Curated annotation (Swiss-Prot):
This is Acetylglutamate kinase. It comes from the Bacteria. One of its GO terms (biological process) is arginine biosynthetic process via ornithine. Catalyzes the ATP-dependent phosphorylation of N-acetyl-L-glutamate. InterPro entries: AceGlu_kinase-like_sf (IPR036393), AcgluKinase_fam (IPR004662), ArgB (IPR037528), Asp/Glu/Uridylate_kinase (IPR001048). The record marks 7, 216 as: Transition state stabilizer. Homodimer.
Length: 257
């Protein structure tokens, strides 16, 4: 079975109970199944809270955080430091051999500046699978932050969805976007099992897919196009469904390019 990349929504970092349910499910799953799993995370909520405390402006353009040179150290510390180690600590507390990484470790993802007007924001491309394959073969659980380093040593903040997509391409892995929603819902509140770009556009125009879900759907569609395979959107609230998700069952909404 191909490896699985689990991209965690940042809101999970604000929910200790959700983190516990996730890692309890992962531990139980690893007792019976050996599918290699890598966790990728951002942490936008955590960064926003930090910026407010430091009285620094939060500026976003098309969903990307503008990251000036005087803020990249703070943001890197929040994502590759606090967010990454919080997840790693919870995983270790549940008996998992977790190892905290960034996109730069082992050259797993190649990162370069996206746009000078955005500052230290990076675009991600697949890199070398060697380190991750060695860690997975040794039964480690890599937990990867969305901070990367360019070839000339520049720290870069990468959109977590794009980071997860690049890592999935690096490993030839499936991608699961795990968030606080169980999937995409129709106008009657029922879960939509399968979604295409055409169907998504229609539901957006009808006002059924709105706000933050539009961002999630577009990110999943872009990932599916890039990877050439379906991408799943599902929720972490129902722990009993997580093992099925880890085994590739479409418990949430399966996105087809």
């Amino acid at each position: 079975m191909d490896p699985l990349i689990i991209k965690l929504g940042g809101v999970l970092l604000d929910n200790p109970q959700a983190m516990e349910r996730l890692f309890q499910a992962l531990l139980a799953y690893r007792h019976h199944d050996r599918r290699p799993i890598v966790i990728v995370h951002g942490g936008g909520c955590l960064v926003d809270e930090l910026m407010v405390r430091l009285q620094l402006p939060v500026v976003k353009r098309q969903g990307l955080r503008v990251t000036p040179a005087d803020q990249i150290g703070i943001i890197s510390g929040a994502l590759a430091g606090t967010a990454n180690k919080t997840l790693q600590a919870c995983a270790i507390a549940h008996g998992l051999a977790a190892i905290g990484l960034s996109l730069a470790d082992g050259g797993a993802v190649q990162v370069s500046p996206l746009d000078a007007s955005l500052g230290h924001v990076g675009q991600a491309l697949p890199g070398s699978p060697l380190l991750l394959r060695q860690l997975l073969a040794a039964d480690f659980l890599p937990i990867v932050s969305s901070i990367g380093i360019s070839a000339d040593g520049m720290l870069l903040n990468v959109n977590a969805d794009q980071a997860a997509t690049a890592l999935a391409a690096t490993l030839g892995a499936d991608l699961l976007m795990l968030s606080d929603v169980s999937g995409i819902l129709d106008g009657k509140g029922q879960r939509i099992a399968e979604m295409t770009a055409q169907k998504a556009q229609r539901l957006i125009e009808q006002g059924i897919i709105t706000d933050g879900m539009v961002v999630k759907v577009n990110a999943a569609l872009e990932a599916a196009r890039t990877l050439g395979r379906p991408v799943d959107i599902a929720g972490w609230r129902h722990a009993e469904k997580l093992p099925a998700l880890f085994n590739g069952e479409a418990v949430g909404t399966r996105i087809h390019a």
